[in-house]
Amino acid sequence: NLEAEQEKGNALISEFCSNANAKGLKVMMDIVVNHTSFDSELLMTNSYWYEHDNDGEIKKPGTLEDGHFIEWGDLLQLDNLSKDLDTRREIWKYWRDYLTYYIELGVKGFRCDAAYMVPTELWKFLIPEIKKQNPEIIFIAETLNCKPEKIKELSAAGFDFVMNSIKWWNYKDHWFMMDYSKWMGTANSLAFPENHDTERFAKEYGTKDKAIAIYAIQSYFSSSIAITTGFEYGFTKKIDVVTTNPLDWEEGTYDITNEIKGINKTKSTYKILQEDSKVYIYDFHNNKVFGYIRESNDGEENILVIANLCETEGVEFYVPNLYNLLRSERVLDISHGHRMERVADEINYYLQPNEVKIFYAKKGE
């Protein structure tokens, strides 16, 4: 009995969302608006909602990798910007009702898969329609592999967060900052040390201190950060979006929950750490040391972040004019680890392997 099973499923989702809310958590849902599976019910009931080629066959979506189009063979492309306006209205109403349905069950946000492939016109309709019902609903755009101009476009369409590519940056090459500089200040971004498309961080690097360092760097760099369950415990088994289930829980290789709490507390205390704004790389002329200065969007706050990227060797850094850099004579050390009681204008400091320092100043103080 399909209706009975649907009722059970809805009750389960609603109960899950309620239990999460009671623990201070909000449930987000992954939605795919660009395409459907090849056996979707929509294909049976509304085949004219799909894009067709010249031979009348439904098109399959895909992506460019190294200049080659990789077709997603088990998926079918929706025609979200149909030239037939009646059809377009049908599709858009479907998506509005679809999201509303799950909001009524308790879902508080949506991670929009391949958001950059969906016509911006649809997002400009859909997001305001949903936020009229509940302004607190969060929309995150999956924007990996898309151009900076598209990120700005999606942000203007109403997305609360876009995803950045800091995960793949070695903190040296220019490509990331070149892309980031084109849209920073126009969108809030979400960083991540691992996700369902990558190897587990612990599998790649294996060390607790490295995990803490990268989490800190990404957290301080981006307005927000996301982790997959198990990152905090050093899980090593790659996530599979189809087959991973609770039986894949691992013993873990380390526990960095306290360190994550400390970094999150610092992040929630200072406004500048909750936005994407102007960043200037501070060159220490040392490949082991990564540093940057950030100025808040309102110009009132500044930070200097310095990290030792080496896992085995400590390194000394020198900053001769910190007060001038941060435009204040009252600079605080707000690092998640060891903190200096008093921060001088001239700093000589020995960074331990994987140590991250963050100095904060407020204009005029």
PLM feature spans:
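Short, acidic/polar
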Residues: 87-103, 210-215
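Acidic/aromatic-lined carbohydrate-recognition and catalytic surfaces
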Residues: 1-73, 78, 82-83, 104, ...
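The substrate-binding groove and active-site-proximal loops of carbohydrate-active enzymes
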Residues: 1-10, 74-91, 108-117, 160-168, ...
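Aromatic/acidic polysaccharide-binding cleft in carbohydrate-active enzymes
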Residues: 187-254
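C-terminal beta-strand-rich structural cap/linker in extracellular carbohydrate-active enzymes
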Residues: 343-365
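Active-site-proximal helices and loops of the catalytic beta/alpha 8
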Residues: 17, 23-24, 97-100, 113-190, ...
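Conserved, mostly hydrophobic/aromatic
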Residues: 20, 30, 102, 112, ...
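Carbohydrate-binding surface patches
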Residues: 282-324
